[in-house]
Amino acid sequence: MSIIKEFREFAMRGNVVDLAVGVIIGAAFGKIVSSLVADIIMPPLGLLIGGIDFKQFAVTLRDAQGDIPAVVMHYGVFIQNVFDFLIVAFAIFMAIKLINKLNRKKEEPAAAPAPTKEEVLLTEIRDLLKEQNNRS
């Protein structure tokens, strides 16, 4: 079997394709969440606490000196990334919770199957034998 044929079979297996689709959708979802946090959530939050833009929060550890740029710790960007993470984690939690709920409904035990003719006959024979033993 040629390597190309083996690779094609490997790549077309359900799990690999599902994983690839999940990664692509996850990357797109991450961009949406980042935009939600940066463009929708953080501006009103900054306005509520005095018109502050979280991206601007930073601490300068060392000022620029000539050609050497300043060393700056941008903790505002970190705060925004924490919000991104929390929203993504909550969205994934809710999706998993919904999936588990749907799976639980599927897993509810089905009604016991009707007994076969043989089982019915054997049950009747057993009951008759019990009656005979009780009479004796």
From Swiss-Prot:
According to its UniProt entry, one GO biological process term is: intracellular water homeostasis
- Its topology with respect to the membrane? Multi-pass membrane protein
Pfam families, per database record: MscL
- Please indicate which superkingdom the organism of origin belongs to: Bacteria
- Could you tell me which InterPro entries the record lists for this protein? Mechanosensitive_channel_CS, MS_channel, MSC/AndL, MscL_channel
UniProt subcellular location: Cell inner membrane
Q: Which SUPFAM superfamilies match?
A: Gated mechanosensitive channel
Q: What GO cellular component is one of the record's annotations? A: plasma membrane
Q: Its Gene Ontology molecular function terms?
A: identical protein binding; mechanosensitive monoatomic ion channel activity
Q: Which residues cross the membrane?
A: 17-45, 75-94
Query: Which of UniProt's keywords are assigned here?
Result: Cell inner membrane, Cell membrane, Ion channel, Ion transport, Membrane, Transmembrane, Transmembrane helix, Transport
Side Cytoplasmic, residues: 1-16, 95-136
Which residues point to the Periplasmic side? Answer: 46-74
- Domain topic, free-text comment: The periplasmic loop between the two transmembrane domains modulates channel kinetics, and in particular the length of time the channel remains in the open conformation.
Report the protein's function.
Answer: Mechanosensitive channel that opens in response to stretch forces in the membrane lipid bilayer. Forms a nonselective ion channel with a conductance of about 4 nanosiemens. Participates in the regulation of osmotic pressure changes within the cell. Opens at a pressure just below that which would cause cell disruption and death. The force required to trigger channel opening depends on the membrane lipids composition.
So what family is this one in? Belongs to the MscL family.
Question: How does this protein assemble?
Answer: Homopentamer.
The protein's name in its UniProt record:
Large-conductance mechanosensitive channel
Q: Which organism is it from?
A: Escherichia coli (strain K12)
